[in-house]
Amino acid sequence: MSLKLIFEIDWLKTLRFNFHYFPLRQAVRIPAYVYWNTSFVEMGGNVHLNCPAKAGLLRIGPHAIGIKDRKTRTLWQVMGGVEVDGSVHLGRGCKVCEEKGALLKIGEHFHVTGDTTIVCKKSVSFGKDCLLSWDVMVMDTDFHHIYGNCEEVNKPRSIAVGNHVWIGMGVTILKGVKICDDVVVSANSSITKNLDESHCVYGGVGRGVEILKRDIDWKR
């Protein structure tokens, strides 16, 4: 471990997180690193590793890119379940907000650059090898309630993102959306419907989202 990394990690919060969420045999391996400027708003629910516990497997709040302020605060507000399948990088400024009874599933090789918000009231899942740029919003709820004929018409609905998906800067993904494997979502898009065709670049807002290019692949 480099000297720079040693000083970037908040070791008190790191120890607190690991020994709060993981059984002793996993916690002693320090599978989660918590970096400076990370706030624990809520440390409820549970975090489950579906893979061997390795040091630094889950990284919360590392500084990733120079154009973002190092003073930006990362927030962890979790009261539901979190499942981790492999390495996870939640860059500085990320906000994870999960309500009691909800489930957040994260596949291996998951990377968020920073300043991204994930709001989970029911279920949000990401497949393996997903990349999220900065200022992304993923939200499976409208927070407030809308009624028609005395029935709620905007209940939370699950979000499912497939494998090898790249979400561009400033994208919003709203409740009920399913995104298939091998997709790129272009910057500043607002996704409210399913993206069903693989190896495509999608872009647009709401019902205007369309395929911008087919037969593509992408690499980090």
Protein language model features and the residues they cover:
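Short secondary-structure boundary/capping segments
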Residues: 151, 191-192
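Short, conserved secondary-structure segments in the cores of folded domains
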Residues: 78-80, 157, 175
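Flexible glycine-rich beta->alpha loop in the catalytic core of nucleotide-sugar glycosyltransferases
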Residues: 143-144, 189-190, 196-197
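Glycine-rich NAD(P)-binding loop of Rossmann-like domains
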Residues: 151-162
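Domain-scale signature associated with acetyltransferase and cell-envelope carbohydrate enzymes
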Residues: 1-139, 162-164, 171, 181, ...
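Conserved sequence/active-site signature of Rossmann-fold short-chain dehydrogenase/reductase
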Residues: 190-191, 207
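Short, flexible helix-coil linker/hinge segments at the edges of structured domains or between repeats
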Residues: 142, 146-153
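A generic "structured core" feature
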Residues: 174, 179-180, 184-190
